[in-house]
Amino acid sequence: MPPGMSDLLPAELHSAPSAEPSPAPASSLPARVGRRIVRRPRNWLESPWPTARIIQYLTALLLVGGCTVAMLQIIHLDLVFSNNTPTGGDMGAHVMGPAYLRDNLMSQGQITGWSNYWYNGLPMYRFYMVVPALMIVALNVILPYGIAFKVVACLGIVTLPFCCWAFGRLARFAFPIPELMAIAGLLFLFDESFTIYGGNVPSTMAGEFSFSIALSFAILGLGLLARGLETGKFRNWTAIVLALAMLSHGIVLIFVVLAAFIMWLVWMDRTRFIYGLTMGIAAVALSAFWVFPFLFNHAYMTDMKYGFRPDGPNDSFWVMFFDLSPFWDIVVTGFALIGFISSVVKRNLNGAWMGITCFALMAAVYLTRDSLPVIGLLWNPRLLPFFYLLRFMLMMVGIVDTVHFVIKGIRTRLPTSRELAVVGAITAVLVGLVVTVTQLFFFRTMPGAEYGTKNGKATYSWGIGGWDLITVSNTGDKLRAYSDSWTAYNFKGYEGREYYGEYKALVDTMASLGADADPDLGCGRALWEVNSSNGLYGTTMALMLLPHWTDGCIASQEGLFFEASGTTPYHFISAAAMSQKSSNPVRELRYTDNDAAVGVPMLQKMGVKYVMVFTEAAKNQADSRDDLELVASSGPWKIYRVFDSEVVVPLTVQPVVVAGRSGDQRERNLELGTSWFQNTDEWAALPADDGPEEWQRIDVAVDMDRRIGTAPLEPGRKVDIVVPSETIEVNELEPITISNYRMGDQTLDFDVSQIGVPVLVKMSYFPNWKVDGADGPYRVAPNFMVVVPTSTSVHMHYEPSTSDRLSYLLTFVGILLMVLWRYRGDVRHLNVHPFATVPTSDDTPTEWATTATWAEEYDASGVPIDASFDVSPPFDHGAFVAPVDDDFVLPSAPVDDASADDASVVADPFTPGVDEPPRLTPDELDEGEHRPPDSV
């Protein structure tokens, strides 16, 4: 120590060292949580704000905010927050589902269960997605039900532009690609070349709002996956968001699995293999409670036999893949190809992934034209929306790469960060203006434009001083976009329809019949005539809500979830026979229209208590029947009671067990069910899939004389008719009586006068049904259950199966895995890019993009790295650059005269840095978030 220095030290240092002070008490959990919540926003605000950063965020605010505002305009917020019941297309029938979940399932601690509301009963939310319904129920806690429903229905289409932007940021694409990806999302939403495939505004308003929600989750989750494959972070968040996407729609599940797998392969190395595997296991486990029961029980669903595309001489795969006008197809696809090629050349893995996934989706559309293997149930055009969206997003990569190529070609030096930011902002604004003008013309809302006539054709033109600068034709079937009008139509609600009074009167009439004390009336199932005039109530599916309005007293035979019940085909066969002109949505069935002599016996077999007819032809048919009784009228409707239509009846002849046949078991059951249902006189006994040993076993064979067509989905083909191959021995049963019949939401009770006699229960068969006081239940034609009482009191109940419970256990395991991943820490990749040749040392920060903090990321020379701009190869991961902004110089990075000039220094992100490791703040040390990560 220099002389005299001790005189400057505090006196305490001359004394003997004292005992170490006790450690400061740890912060409380609320304090740590509070610091965690505010830390990132605080760091974001306190980071330096150079010109380039300001331009970037202002551009993002303008474009992402503008896209979101545009979507809010389209959905008509004033109507969204009107307290009414949404209608229109399938959406008008979707109203029932979340309300049933709230009132009948969640009150019992369930999110899946049974409902008797539609199709003689169906498993509720086993084959349809429960997450969007749960969101509606949660929001209904603070908002009226109709408003909560509409808010959630709009959630996917409103958030998609933001999620596309977030994907671009998370995948580290160059500015302004993420901002332009928000516009790509908007273009996809306004694409009206398809209306029922899913994802865009028309599909969402048609009822596919679960699809649009799932799509937003999917894009966000894939962005998180891209960031995680780069940095090893966000493993749990990625698993959660991708699981939500898979749980929100089954078709999106296919896309998520395919896209995530391809991204994993593109990024693959040793540590990224571990990251993808562990994240994927967690995501699958989290979704197991819904996905696995769906997969294990798909044989009990109805295949609607939608066919495939291309369909007909005027359809082709070319038409499917290039759905826009020729000009826009060339523009969109051309720039998308440029984006893909440039990404491959620059080894931008996420850009290359988008292109590869587009080609994979095209292949999937072709390969699934005969539906999915084993499961079936897929209409191959449902995969097209993912291709369309990724193509729009990849187009934006191509546009920006083209601009960068042009700039590099005309300049002799590297552009500064400010110049790059300005160029990026100008590019983004110009693209935004082109899209805005295009959409304003598309919606016929261009300021200053007017309708006119040119060369004898109606036009819509915009110009200045009498000169028409832009003119579009206003002739043909489609004059303007209808996304905005469709949302307005839906959200005006049932209550806003001109014929709402007639509709409400009909519902009230049915409710009064259900409340009638007459034992011949009361609650029961109702079949209503299919006719287009029902659309006057808001949707042709309006009467599907009969159980919703009557608290389940009057069940509707027809419901929205067509595929969720194996009884669906038999309803539509019955409805056709009782309707003047039926919809016949299940293909290949042998329908008979408007013949009550055929229809009434079918209603009796189905246990239908009421039939509601609208047309004069159907009324005349009903009036001619002695087994129908007119019990009420309401407006143009007549309501008849069906005689001998009890739900639980004793059998008079012992059933026979039909031996199994090879092939698609869903098709084999449909053949057997329709053969008995439509040709009962050819069967001496009720056919069953299984039964006691004393029941006769028989074989059946296809009646070749009545076969129409052979190949599945062949035009004109009909389901085969099967007949017994041997004589059925008629074993008559003793007559018994049924009493004390009671049907609950998920139970059915009745008493019998004698045990041992089989009893038919006209409720959809499903293996989760169990019975106390009887053997069975056994599946019988058409899709019902038979029990053999062993007690005079029989109790049937729906409960989770063993496989269901194992699926729930897997989801619990998924939660435990996320706890384990959180405890073990992030996966530590050797490099930030799998093609890098220089490993990243422990002292080299691996996060070098603006998505962390602006000032904390440096290259080897101390220059701040901004991942938002372009950099030359060798490895261009999303087009990186290290700009120098003359407004922002780090104190730790001395600048000489040459570098002080407004020149850029391009950094190689794969050169090990010489900076110190990021220093931890006391808050970060307190939270324990920066422990050395394990390899897993």
Language model regions located:
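Membrane-embedded transmembrane-helix bundle of lipid-linked glycan/lipid transferases
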Residues: 2, 6-494, 505, 512-517, ...
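Generic beta-strand/beta-sheet core signal
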Residues: 256, 527-529, 614, 643
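Short acidic, glycine/proline-enriched helix-loop-strand junctions
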Residues: 618-645
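Intrinsically disordered, compositionally biased tail regions
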Residues: 905-907, 911-936
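Active-site-proximal, structured, solvent-exposed surfaces of multi-pass membrane proteins
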Residues: 49, 702-854, 935
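Extracytoplasmic/secreted cell-surface and envelope-processing proteins
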Residues: 255-256, 294, 535-538, 618-623, ...
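Solvent-exposed loop/turn segments at secondary-structure junctions
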Residues: 190, 250, 532-536, 611, ...
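Extracytoplasmic/lumenal acceptor-recognition loop(s) of multi-pass membrane glycoenzymes
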Residues: 242, 434-497, 501, 511-602, ...
